[in-house]
C-alpha cells in the first residue's frame, strides 16, 4: 500500500474518531498563555489545562495531529536520521476514561490491522513493576524475548512532584539492511537511538501522584497521553532509510536539486561515504529549516534578535549557509515555499493565505543576512591577521552575526588555527540556556527546591527608571545557590528592582546594572528577567561578576519600557474595543506585548471584515485623542469583580490577596500586572498590521503604536509597493503588444496613476488598488501565455511533420524547455496523423534530458535504448516517458536505429 503522510495522518484520526475520540485541530505553534514553553513541542502541550483539571475537556477521549517545533539541539539536524526541527505528533488521549488495557489494544489494532505492520517485528519496553502492561502485550502474542522490562530511568515519567506514571514504548524492527554492523539489538537494549529498531509510539500512563518526597499514591483520575511522530511512522511504512527520505521531504529535495549542481541520493545512506554524507546533510538542513520557517512566519513570528524571532532568524541563516555549500540558486526559495504549503495545506489550511507573506519576509531577511555575513567575515579575517582570534570572538560570530557552529569550526580549520573549543562550547551552552529559561518562565522552575526555598523579599517598582539595590540572591545556571560568580553566567536577585519580569504575555524589560562593588564599576547587561516561584525577579546574565551584598545601580531601557507600555495599554484598549464594537462574547485567549508590537488572540466563528477592523481601530484612535488617564487600583478578588474587571484566569487570581486593576475610564477595566501608560495620549496612534486565522475558529490581530513605529512601518510597506509595481511593469513588458494592445494600454495607465500612500490611513486602499491591478495583469499574463503556447504547439507540429519521411520508420527530434504536457499533446496529434511512424523526442527541460517515445510496440524500442544508454522511466506499448542520464543526441539515435 502507498502510504503518504496525508494518508497516515488521516488514518490515525479516522481510527480514533471511530473509537469515540473527539478530533481536535492542530493548535498554533505559539503557546497560548503558557510562558513555560517557547514553542508547542509535543501533542499534549496544548492539552495541559485539561490534564491539570483547570479546564473541562470537550470530551474525555481526544485525538489530534499537532504541528511541533524543537530547536534545543539544532546542530544535529541534517546529520542524524530522525532529528528535525518541525515535526507532527499524532496522539490519542484519555482524561479519566480508558486506561492501560484499552490504550494498548488500540495501539496494537491500529498498527497491525490498519497500518498493516508485522507484529512479529514489534519490540516493546515496559516499566519493570508494571505487570498489567506486560501481560497485555503477551495477550497480543508479542514474543516474550521482544519485551524488555526497564527501570524508572527509561520507562517512568516523573517530574519530581505531581502526576506521574509508567510508560510503554513500541519499537519496530526494520531489518538487517539498516543494521550493517549487527549492533542494532545491543543499541536497542541500551536505549541508544539506532536505525534498525525505531520507536514509533509511546504510551504514558498517568497513574500516581508524587508528593515531592518520593511518596507515590494512586490518582483518583487516571489519564492516558500517547505520542507517535508522524515522520518516524511514515519512514517505517515507506521503508525509507531516514525521515528525510519520505514523501514530503523528497518533494522539497527534488526542488533543491533542480537549482544546484549536486544530486541527492537516498541510497547514499548505505555507502558510508563521509563526503557524500556531508553533502546530503545540506539538502536535509534546507528542506527541514524551510518547513519550520514557513510555518513559523505564517503564524506571525518574523526573524529578529530575541526569543522566538531569533529562532526563526537562526533557522533561516543556517539554511542559507547550507545553500551556499550546495552553490544553490536562490530562485528555488519561492518554489520550495509553494511546495511546502501545497504539501500541508489540506490539513493546515491557514498556510495558503500566508504564502506571499512568507516569501517576502524570507527574501528581505536574506538580503539583510548577506550583508551580515560579509561583516562577520571581515571581523574574522581581521582577527586572524592580527592574531586575536579567541573563543569569545568565534562565539560572537554565532551570537551576533548568525554563523552556524559547524561553519565557524570550518572557518577556523581552513585557516589551520587552533582555539580552545571547550571555552567556546561553554559560551554556547550558556547562550542556549537563555532559550531554555525562556521556555521555563512559568513559575520559573516551580519544581526546583532551591528556588522554592528562596523566600527573601524583593520589591519591584513599576514607576521608577533607576534604583540603587543590593544583591540578596545568586544562583548559577543550574539554579544552585552560590555566594559569588566571577565572569560567569547565572541569576541575580536584588532587594529591589525596576526591571519588569516576563509575565502576562509581556516581555521582560531590556536593562542593565552597574556593580559598584567591582573596582571598575562593571556594567552588566541582562538577557532575561523571570519570576521565581516566590515572585522575586531573577535577572539572567551571560557574563558577569557578583557577590552577595554587592551594591548596584539598576536601570531599564526607558525607550523600550515606554514602547512596551504603549503596546500593553493598546492591547487592553483593543480587547475592550473588540468586545464593545464587534461582539461582547469575544475573550482574549492569548496575547503578546513588547516594544515592537502587541498581539491578541481570540475565538470567533467568523472572519472580521476590513470595515469592522477599521471600526475598532478608529475607536482606539478616539480613545487616544480623548487623553484618558489610567488608574491603578489595588484590591482583592471580590473587589475586582465589583469593578467588572476582566480576569483571564479567575481560579488563579482568586488565590491572591491583593490584585492590581488597570482602568482606562469606563471603557477598559482589567486585572493586570504589566506596565502601562499614564495617559492614552502617550500611545500617539495605532494601526492594525495584520489579522489572520490560527485555525479552529481562533484569530490573531497584530497592532502597533507610536508615530515613529507607524512611520517606519509605512516606509517599509511603501518599499514593498514600489517593488510590486516594478514587478508588474516587468510583466507588462513581456506581454505581446501586437495581440493585447488595448488591454496593455488600459493596465499601463492604471499602473502609471498609482500613487504611494503618504499617511498610514491610506495604506490599505493603496495596497488593495495595487493588488487588484496585480490580479488583472496576471489574468492578461495567463491569456498571453495560452496564446504563446498555442503558437508554440503549432510550431512544434510543423517541425515534426517536416521530419516525417515515408522512407523512414522513425521521427527523431530534440526541443529545449518545452512544457512536457504541451509537447505530449502536440506529439499525440502528430502521431494520430502518422500512426505507422515511431516518434523519439528529446526535451531538455529543467536541466534534465526528458524523453518521450510514441509509436507501435515501444517496449522493443525501449529495450534497445536501455542496452545502449542509461535510461530511466516507464510506460506501455504505445507510450514511454523517461529521462537520459547520458548525453544523447538525435545523431546517436539515428545511428542506433539506422534511421537513414
From Swiss-Prot:
Entry keyword set: Aminoacyl-tRNA synthetase, ATP-binding, Cytoplasm, Ligase, Metal-binding, Nucleotide-binding, Protein biosynthesis, RNA-binding, tRNA-binding, Zinc
Disulphide bonds in the chain: none
Locations listed in the record: Cytoplasm
Any note on cofactor binding? Binds 1 zinc ion per subunit.
Which reactions fall under this protein's catalytic activity? tRNA(Ala) + L-alanine + ATP = L-alanyl-tRNA(Ala) + AMP + diphosphate
GO molecular-function term, one example from the UniProt record = aminoacyl-tRNA deacylase activity
Q: Which residues bind Zn(2+)?
A: 568, 572, 672, 676
Alphabetized SUPFAM superfamilies for the sequence? Class II aaRS and biotin synthetases (SSF55681), Putative anticodon-binding domain of alanyl-tRNA synthetase (AlaRS) (SSF101353), ThrRS/AlaRS common domain (SSF55186), Translation proteins (SSF50447)
- The primary location reported for this protein is cytoplasm
Q: Which residues cross the membrane?
A: none
| Cofactor(s) this protein cannot do without | Zn(2+)
InterPro entries to which the protein is assigned, alphabetical: aa-tRNA-synth_II/BPL/LPL (IPR045864), Ala-tRNA-lgiase_IIc (IPR002318), Ala-tRNA-ligase_IIc_anticod-bd (IPR018162), Ala-tRNA-synth_IIc_core (IPR018165), Ala-tRNA-synth_IIc_N (IPR018164), Ala-tRNA_ligase (IPR050058), Ala_tRNA_ligase_euk/bac (IPR023033), Thr/Ala-tRNA-synth_IIc_edit (IPR018163)
Name the enzyme's class.
ligase
Q: What is its EC number?
A: 6.1.1.7
Give the CC-aspect GO terms.
Answer: cytosol
Q: Which GO terms describe its biological process?
A: alanyl-tRNA aminoacylation
Q: What's in the domain note?
A: Consists of three domains; the N-terminal catalytic domain, the editing domain and the C-terminal C-Ala domain. The editing domain removes incorrectly charged amino acids, while the C-Ala domain, along with tRNA(Ala), serves as a bridge to cooperatively bring together the editing and aminoacylation centers thus stimulating deacylation of misacylated tRNAs.
- Which family is it part of? Belongs to the class-II aminoacyl-tRNA synthetase family.
Q: Main role?
A: Catalyzes the attachment of alanine to tRNA(Ala) in a two-step reaction: alanine is first activated by ATP to form Ala-AMP and then transferred to the acceptor end of tRNA(Ala). Also edits incorrectly charged Ser-tRNA(Ala) and Gly-tRNA(Ala) via its editing domain.
The name on file for this protein is: Alanine--tRNA ligase
Species annotation: Mycoplasma genitalium (strain ATCC 33530 / DSM 19775 / NCTC 10195 / G37) (Mycoplasmoides genitalium)
Organism phylogeny = Bacteria, Bacillati, Mycoplasmatota, Mycoplasmoidales, Mycoplasmoidaceae
Amino acid at each position: 500500500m502507498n502510504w503518504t503522510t496525508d494518508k497516515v495522518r488521516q488514518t490515525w484520526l479516522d481510527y480514533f474518531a471511530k473509537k469515540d475520540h473527539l478530533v481536535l485541530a492542530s493548535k498554533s505553534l505559539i503557546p497560548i498563555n503558557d510562558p513555560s514553553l517557547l514553542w508547542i513541542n509535543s501533542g499534549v502541550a496544548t492539552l495541559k489545562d485539561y490534564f491539570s483539571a483547570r479546564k473541562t475537556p470537550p470530551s474525555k477521549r481526544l485525538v489530534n495531529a499537532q504541528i511541533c517545533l524543537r530547536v534545543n539541539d539544532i546542530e544535529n539536524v541534517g546529520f542524524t536520521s530522525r532529528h528535525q526541527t518541525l515535526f507532527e505528533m499524532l496522539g490519542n488521549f484519555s482524561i479519566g476514561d480508558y486506561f492501560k488495557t484499552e490504550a494498548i489494544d488500540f495501539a496494537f489494532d491500529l498498527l497491525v490491522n490498519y497500518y498493516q505492520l508485522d507484529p512479529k517485528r514489534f519490540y516493546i519496553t515496559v516499566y519493570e513493576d508494571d505487570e498489567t502492561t506486560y501481560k497485555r502485550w503477551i495477550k497480543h502474542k508479542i514474543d516474550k524475548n521482544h519485551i524488555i522490562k526497564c527501570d524508572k530511568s527509561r520507562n517512568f515519567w516523573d517530574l519530581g512532584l505531581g502526576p506521574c506514571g509508567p510508560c510503554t514504548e513500541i519499537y519496530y524492527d526494520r531489518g538487517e539492511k539498516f543494521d550493517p554492523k549487527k549492533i542494532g539489538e545491543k543499541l536497542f537494549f541500551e536505549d541508544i537511538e539506532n536505525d534498525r529498531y525505531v520507536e514509533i509510539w509511546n504510551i504514558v500512563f498517568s497513574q500516581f501522584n508524587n508528593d515531592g518526597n518520593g511518596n507515590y499514591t494512586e490518582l483518583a483520575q487516571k489519564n492516558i497521553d500517547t505520542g507517535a511522530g508522524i515522520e518516524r511512522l511514515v519512514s517505517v511504512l515507506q521503508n525509507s532509510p531516514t525521515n528525510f527520505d519520505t514523501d514530503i521531504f523528497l518533494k522539497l529535495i527534488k526542488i533543491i536539486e533542480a537549482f544546484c549542481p549536486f544530486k541527492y541520493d537516498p541510497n547514499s545512506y548505505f555507502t558510508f561515504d563521509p563526503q557524500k554524507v556531508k553533502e546530503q546533510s545540506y539538502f536535509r538542513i534546507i528542506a527541514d529549516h524551510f518547513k519550520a520557517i514557513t510555518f513559523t512566519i505564517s503564524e506571525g513570528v518574523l526573524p529578529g534578535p530575541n526569543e522566538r524571532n531569533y529562532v526563526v532568524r537562526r533557522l533561516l541563516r543556517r539554511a542559507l549557509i547550507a545553500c551556499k555549500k550546495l552553490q544553490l540558486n536562490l530562485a528555488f526559495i519561492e518554489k520550495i515555499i509553494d511546495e511546502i504549503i501545497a504539501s500541508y495545506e489540506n490539513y493546515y489550511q491557514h498556510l495558503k493565505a500566508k504564502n506571499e507573506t512568507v516569501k517576502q519576509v524570507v527574501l528581505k531577511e536574506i538580503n539583510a543576512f548577506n550583508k551580515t555575513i560579509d561583516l562577520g567575515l571581515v571581523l574574522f579575517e581581521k582577527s586572524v591577521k592580527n592574531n586575536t582570534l579567541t573563543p569569545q570572538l568565534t562565539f560572537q560570530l554565532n551570537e551576533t552575526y548568525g554563523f552556524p557552529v559547524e561553519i565557524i569550526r570550518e572557518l577556523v580549520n581552513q585557516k589551520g588555527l587552533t582555539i580552545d573549543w571547550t571555552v567556546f562550547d561553554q559560551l554556547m551552552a550558556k547562550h542556549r540556556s537563555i532559550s531554555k529559561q525562556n521556555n521555563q518562565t512559568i513559575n520559573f522552575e516551580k519544581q526546583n527546591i532551591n528556588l522554592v526555598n528562596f523566600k527573601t523579599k524583593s520589591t519591584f517598582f513599576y514607576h521608577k527608571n533607576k534604583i540603587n539595590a543590593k544583591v540578596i540572591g545568586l544562583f548559577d545556571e543550574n539554579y544552585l545557590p552560590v555566594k559569588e560568580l566571577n565572569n560567569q553566567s547565572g541569576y541575580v536577585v536584588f532587594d529591589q528592582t525596576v526591571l519588569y519580569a516576563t509575565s502576562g504575555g509581556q516581555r521582560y524589560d531590556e536593562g542593565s546594572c552597574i556593580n559598584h562593588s567591582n573596582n571598575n564599576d562593571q556594567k552588566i547587561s541582562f538577557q532575561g528577567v523571570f519570576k521565581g516561584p516566590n515572585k522575586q525577579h531573577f535577572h539572567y546574565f551571560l557574563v558577569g561578576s557578583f557577590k552577595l551584598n554587592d551594591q548596584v545601580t539598576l536601570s531599564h531601557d526607558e525607550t523600550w519600557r515606554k514602547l512596551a507600555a504603549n503596546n500593553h495599554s493598546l492591547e487592553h484598549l483593543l480587547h475592550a474595543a473588540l468586545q464593545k464594537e464587534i461582539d461582547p462574547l469575544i475573550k482574549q485567549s492569548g496575547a503578546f506585548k513588547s516594544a515592537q508590537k502587541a498581539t491578541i488572540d481570540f475565538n470567533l466563528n467568523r472572519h472580521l471584515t476590513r470595515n469592522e477592523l477599521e471600526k475598532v481601530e478608529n475607536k482606539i484612535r478616539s480613545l487616544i485623542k480623548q487623553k484618558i488617564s489610567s488608574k491603578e487600583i489595588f484590591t482583592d478578588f471580590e473587589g475586582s469583580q465589583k469593578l467588572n474587571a476582566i480576569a483571564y484566569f479567575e481560579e488563579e487570581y482568586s488565590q491572591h490577596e491583593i490584585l492590581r486593576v488597570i482602568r482606562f475610564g469606563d471603557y477598559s477595566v482589567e486585572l493586570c500586572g504589566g506596565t502601562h501608560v499614564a495617559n492614552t495620549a502617550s500611545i500617539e496612534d495605532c494601526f492594525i498590521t495584520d489579522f489572520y486565522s490560527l485555525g479552529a475558529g481562533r484569530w490573531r490581530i497584530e497592532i502597533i503604536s507610536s508615530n515613529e513605529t507607524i512611520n517606519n512601518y509605512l516606509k517599509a510597506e511603501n518599499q514593498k509597493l514600489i517593488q510590486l509595481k516594478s514587478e508588474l511593469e516587468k510583466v507588462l513588458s513581456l506581454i505581446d503588444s501586437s495581440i493585447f494592445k488595448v488591454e496593455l494600454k488600459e493596465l499601463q495607465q492604471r499602473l502609471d496613476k498609482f500613487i504611494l500612500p503618504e499617511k498610514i490611513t491610506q495604506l490599505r486602499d493603496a495596497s488593495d488598488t495595487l493588488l487588484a491591478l496585480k490580479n488583472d495583469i496576471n489574468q492578461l499574463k495567463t491569456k498571453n501565455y495560452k496564446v504563446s503556447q498555442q503558437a508554440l504547439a503549432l510550431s512544434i507540429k510543423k517541425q515534426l511533420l517536416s521530419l516525417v519521411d515515408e522512407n523512414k520508420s522513425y521521427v527523431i527530434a530534440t526541443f529545449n524547455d518545452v512544457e512536457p504536457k504541451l509537447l505530449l499533446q502536440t506529439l499525440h496529434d502528430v502521431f494520430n496523423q502518422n500512426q505507422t511512424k515511431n516518434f523519439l523526442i528529446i526535451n531538455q527541460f529543467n536541466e534534465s534530458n526528458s524523453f518521450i517515445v510514441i509509436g507501435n510496440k515501444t517496449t522493443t524500442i525501449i529495450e534497445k535504448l536501455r542496452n545502449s544508454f542509461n535510461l530511466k522511466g516507464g510506460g506501455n506499448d504505445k507510450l514511454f516517458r523517461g529521462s537520459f542520464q547520458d548525453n544523447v543526441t538525435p545523431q546517436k539515435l539515428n545511428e542506433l536505429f539506422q534511421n537513414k
